[in-house]
């Protein structure tokens, strides 16, 4: 499965415990697809919300590309519909209703058929001490790798 990752949401991995990952298609306009191919995407603070039985990607910033139609300037942070099966949406709706659970966007990529996809995750927020533990663990892992590299 060759997938070309365009953008990652590193902040989501730091702020949340990831419980389950899903792949969802994204309903985009042509100029947005061109902008994604050019790498003009920012997923910081983006999340998924289920509204009236449909999943939407909110706060994802897809920049306007200057080479597209100059008379049409789309909203760069508009809600984008995510394409999921009904059973998946129902399952996510039930899971998100639990306190502390949320849906976050982890990455946007093109799959082997050149379709734009979003990797979303069911996540639970971390506390401050969890974030500190994550940082300590990363530092220890780095030190261990450096020590192994020396020998």
UniProtKB/Swiss-Prot annotation:
CDD domains: SmpB (cd09294). GO terms for biological process: trans-translation. It holds the Pfam family SmpB. GO terms for molecular function: RNA binding. The keyword RNA-binding applies. It is found in: Cytoplasm. The keyword Thylakoid does not apply. GO terms for cellular component: cytosol. It comes from the Bacteria. InterPro entries: SmpB, SsrA-bd_prot, SsrA-bd_prot_CS. Keywords: Cytoplasm, RNA-binding. Belongs to the SmpB family. NCBIfam families: PRK05422.1 (NF003843), smpB (TIGR00086). Required for rescue of stalled ribosomes mediated by trans-translation. Binds to transfer-messenger RNA (tmRNA), required for stable association of tmRNA with ribosomes. tmRNA and SmpB together mimic tRNA shape, replacing the anticodon stem-loop with SmpB. tmRNA is encoded by the ssrA gene; the 2 termini fold to resemble tRNA(Ala) and it encodes a 'tag peptide', a short internal open reading frame. During trans-translation Ala-aminoacylated tmRNA acts like a tRNA, entering the A-site of stalled ribosomes, displacing the stalled mRNA. This is SsrA-binding protein. It comes from Wolinella succinogenes (strain ATCC 29543 / DSM 1740 / CCUG 13145 / JCM 31913 / LMG 7466 / NCTC 11488 / FDC 602W).
């Amino acid at each position: 499965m060759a997938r070309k990752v365009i953008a990652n949401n590193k902040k989501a991995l730091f702020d949340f415990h990831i419980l389950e990952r899903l792949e969802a298609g994204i309903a985009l306009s042509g100029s947005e697809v061109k902008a994604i191919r050019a790498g003009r995407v920012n997923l910081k603070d983006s999340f998924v919300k289920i509204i009236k039985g449909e999943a939407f990607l909110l706060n994802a910033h897809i920049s306007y590309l200057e080479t597209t139609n100059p008379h049409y300037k789309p909203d760069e942070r508009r809600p984008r519909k995510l394409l999921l099966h009904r059973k998946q949406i129902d399952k996510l709706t039930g899971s998100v209703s639990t306190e502390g659970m949320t849906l976050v966007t982890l990455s946007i990529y093109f799959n082997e058929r050149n379709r734009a996809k979003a990797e979303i995750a069911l996540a639970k927020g971390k506390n401050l001490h969890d974030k500190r533990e994550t940082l300590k663990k990363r530092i220890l892992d780095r030190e261990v790798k450096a020590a192994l590299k020396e020998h």
